[in-house]
């Protein structure tokens, strides 16, 4: 959401090894034409360059982001690094491969794709943490997890005591 043009691009803000989609989300106005979360084209900026080039990536976008993160930590395992991994999951329009949403179709949930996106994210996060362990760097890596999409499935406050907020 910070902009697609200089001086607001990731490479203008100090990031040296970047894979990103343009605009606020995959498939939005200034993103690469035809991106739909699967087998998309994203901009890659390689270390030592400032201008990126568009590159086709295979797979689901969240899998791509984590695969690139694992490539990055593997390449930088012997020196201090900062990895900023901002995914679009779970976020509308809630697209995910059917095998991730399928287990939630049997449940009484209003959006199985939302929960499928979370399951896919959790799987990928586990792979990344395992990679840190396999590389022997988990004990010297500060790992922060933050999210801003927790209410995307809706808010349920009926079970809470909201009497103080009623006035």
Task: Please annotate each region the language model reported.
Residues 2-81, 87-101, 105, 115:
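Formylglycine-dependent
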Residues 5-14, 93-98, 130-167:
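Histidine-centered active-site microenvironments of extracellular/periplasmic hydrolases
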Residues 17-20, 81-86, 119, 142-146, ...:
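Structural recognition of the beta-strand scaffold that forms the well-ordered cores
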Residues 20-25, 106-110, 156, 166:
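Short, Lys/Arg-enriched charge-dense amphipathic segments
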Residues 26-50, 126-135, 144, 154, ...:
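Substrate-binding rim/cap in mid-to-C-terminal beta-strand-loop elements of soluble/periplasmic
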Residues 58-61, 118-121, 154-162:
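Short linear motifs at secondary-structure transitions and domain/linker junctions
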Residues 66-73, 101-141, 158:
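A long, amphipathic alpha-helix that forms part
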């Amino acid at each position: 959401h910070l902009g697609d043009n200089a001086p607001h691009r990731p490479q203008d803000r100090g990031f040296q090894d970047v894979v990103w989609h343009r605009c606020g989300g995959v498939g939005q106005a200034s993103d690469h034409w035809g991106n739909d979360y699967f087998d998309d084209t994203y901009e890659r900026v390689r270390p030592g360059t400032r201008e990126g080039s568009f590159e086709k990536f295979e797979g689901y976008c969240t899998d791509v982001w984590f695969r690139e993160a694992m490539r990055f930590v593997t390449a930088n395992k012997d020196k201090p690094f900062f990895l900023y991994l901002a995914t679009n999951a779970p976020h509308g329009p809630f697209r995910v491969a059917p095998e991730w949403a399928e287990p939630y179709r049997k449940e009484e949930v209003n959006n199985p794709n939302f929960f499928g996106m979370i399951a896919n994210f959790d799987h990928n996060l586990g792979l990344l943490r395992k990679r840190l362990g396999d590389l022997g760097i988990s004990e010297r890596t500060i790992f922060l997890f933050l999210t801003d999409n927790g209410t995307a499935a809706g808010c349920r406050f009926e079970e809470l005591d909201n009497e103080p907020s009623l006035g």
